[in-house]
């Protein structure tokens, strides 16, 4: 019997044995020919032998000493795969990595860890990142869930709120109109929107212009309506900044001014006492303001003006920086009047030109594929869905949805326009940028009296925050030039960062724009600071690129 079993087993394992003849039999029968084989007796004998062999082999195994299972051989079959480790984290589909991404394997691994850190620190349900190098997307990935309830993982195609990055998109519309001679940035806004009343500040007639609106210098309020609280907070921040600057200058010059230390200390204590009530935490933050959760649908930007057009200016236009999303609502109305088109129609044309085909205004009714859900933690520290909001009153300042891929395209279009003028002499065949080089230089030039809340080293420019190149000491920290904008909405956070290459003559003569790193990150959790993470990721890729 043992010999019978061995013979049967050997035949089954041999090439062209049982499995092979079963395959031939199936093909033969499908062709309508008589079945192959040695007759029913041979088949019965073979089946009996197999059954006895399996039973006997089972008995022999029971008597044999236990052995660890053999490691799988990846070359045994083209379909064979190594065993997968079990993980509690959701599987996140990724876009197949382009060949050029292999050059950035180290940067990708390091950046993925940075992304995990910020996600874990804030408890974000999901986060998506995209990176491009010199105009080519080299990495995009999602971590966590786009929809926690239905266990839908984040992926590169996930659509989320981009919040205030919408301001940078609106700036392109304004810039195109300015380039076409249809918009004057420096005349009163009433020339285009007479529905917005003329303003006074402390009894003096003042002018609000498009340029001031773009850089948040118009004095128009943000979500906080209490002018006293806003002014107290500004005073406290100014005092704090002054103290930091004085300390820095003293350290730099090596002077202590010990004689006046006591007097200065006493004065500072008095000033701080005056401003103590306006410290962060006393004043409501944006997410505690009722207007952020509006559910009313507005038909157009002109109609949205009624929310704030009759409110007093908080500061004299041009004198102080006051970040204002409502200022961009007024800019949307200016776009409509200067272009003769509805704001959303004009923006859709721009998105089409830039190949940003998944970027749309956020509306509840339309089916938007791959749209994420948005979350916040309640007072009991439990994850909950955010309430329904209608963003039609602020399309221009924070009402668009997009993907990391579309944001990379937008960033590269801006970087190309910024750099193409430098390459024209060495390559006359280059296409023009979507915006002219002089326009991009204007947009990315810091404006006096402004602030950049997400990086104190920078200033606000024209719908972008800009950090300029700076190095104070030799062989010490070098501050890179970059432009970025962050976003914070109900249940969402975002950032788009552009790190231009520091160009030299060799690069200009042998390469083509855009030259630099673009990073976009979107997250379905509010109040997540992403700019520093985006900058670290950009520098990781820049390091690999340089090597």
From Swiss-Prot:
Keyword annotations of the record: Acetylation, Hydrolase, Lipid metabolism, Mitochondrion, Protease, Transit peptide, Tumor suppressor
Location of the active site: 164
Species assigned in the record: Homo sapiens
Modified-residue entries (N6-acetyllysine), positions: 297, 342
Effect noted on mutating residue 469 to K: Does not affect serine protease activity; shows reduced tumor suppressor activity; shows reduced ability to down-regulate phosphatidylethanolamine (PtdEtn) levels
Localization per record: Mitochondrion
Molecular function terms, GO-annotated: identical protein binding; peptidase activity
Transit peptide: 1-115
Protein name, per record: Serine beta-lactamase-like protein LACTB, mitochondrial
Organism lineage string: Eukaryota, Metazoa, Chordata, Craniata, Vertebrata
Highest taxon above the source species: Eukaryota
Feature: compositional bias, Low complexity: 62-83
């Amino acid at each position: 019997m043992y010999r019978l079993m061995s013979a049967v087993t050997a035949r089954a394992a041999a090439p062209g044995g049982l499995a092979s003849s079963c395959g031939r039999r199936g093909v033969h029968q499908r062709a309508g020919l008589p079945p192959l084989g040695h007759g029913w007796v041979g088949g019965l004998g073979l089946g009996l032998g197999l059954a006895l062999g399996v039973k006997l082999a089972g008995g022999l195994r029971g008597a044999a000493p236990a052995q660890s299972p053999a490691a799988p051989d990846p070359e045994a079959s083209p379909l064979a795969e190594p065993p997968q480790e079990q993980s509690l984290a959701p599987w996140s589909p990724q876009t197949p990595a382009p060949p050029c991404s292999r050059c950035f394997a180290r940067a990708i691994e390091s950046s993925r860890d940075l992304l995990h850190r910020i996600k874990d620190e804030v408890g974000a349900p999901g986060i998506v990142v995209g990176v491009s190098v010199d105009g080519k997307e080299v990495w995009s990935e999602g971590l966590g869930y786009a929809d926690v309830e239905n266990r839908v993982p984040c992926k590169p195609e996930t659509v989320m709120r981009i919040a205030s990055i919408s301001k940078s998109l609106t700036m392109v519309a304004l810039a195109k109109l300015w380039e076409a001679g249809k918009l004057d940035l420096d005349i009163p806004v009433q020339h285009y929107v007479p529905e917005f009343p003329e303003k006074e500040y402390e009894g003096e007639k003042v002018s609000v212009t498009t340029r001031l609106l773009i850089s948040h210098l118009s004095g128009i309020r943000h979500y906080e309506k209490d002018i006293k609280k806003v002014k107290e907070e500004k005073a406290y921040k100014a005092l704090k900044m002054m103290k930091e600057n004085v300390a820095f200058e003293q350290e730099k010059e090596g002077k202590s001014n010990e004689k006046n230390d006591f007097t200065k200390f006493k004065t500072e204590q008095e000033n701080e006492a005056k401003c103590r009530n306006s410290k962060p935490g006393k004043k409501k933050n944006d997410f505690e303001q009722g207007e952020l959760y509006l559910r009313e649908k507005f038909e157009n930007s002109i109609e949205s003006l009624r929310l704030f057009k009759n409110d007093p200016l908080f500061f004299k236009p041009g004198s102080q920086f006051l970040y204002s999303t409502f200022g961009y609502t007024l800019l949307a109305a200016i776009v409509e009047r200067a272009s003769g088109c509805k704001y959303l129609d004009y923006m859709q044309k721009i998105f089409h030109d830039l190949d940003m085909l998944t970027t749309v205004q956020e509306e509840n009714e339309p089916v938007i594929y791959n749209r994420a859900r948005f979350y916040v933690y309640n007072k009991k520290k439990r994850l909950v869905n955010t309430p329904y909001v209608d963003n039609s009153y602020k399309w221009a300042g924070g009402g668009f949805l997009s993907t990391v891929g579309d944001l990379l395209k937008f960033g590269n279009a801006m970087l190309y326009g910024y750099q193409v003028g430098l390459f024209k002499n060495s390559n006359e065949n280059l296409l023009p940028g979507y915006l002219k080089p002089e326009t991009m230089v204007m947009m990315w030039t810091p404006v006096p009296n402004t602030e950049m809340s997400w990086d104190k080293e920078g200033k606000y420019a024209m719908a972008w925050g800009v950090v300029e190149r700076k190095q104070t000491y030799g062989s010490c920290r070098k501050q890179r030039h970059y432009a970025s904008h962050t976003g914070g909405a109900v249940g969402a956070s975002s950032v788009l960062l552009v790190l231009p290459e520091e160009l030299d003559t060799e690069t200009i003569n042998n390469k083509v724009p855009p030259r630099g790193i673009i990073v976009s990150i979107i997250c379905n959790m509010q109040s997540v600071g992403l700019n520093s993470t985006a900058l670290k990721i950009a520098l990781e890729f820049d390091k690999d690129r340089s090597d």
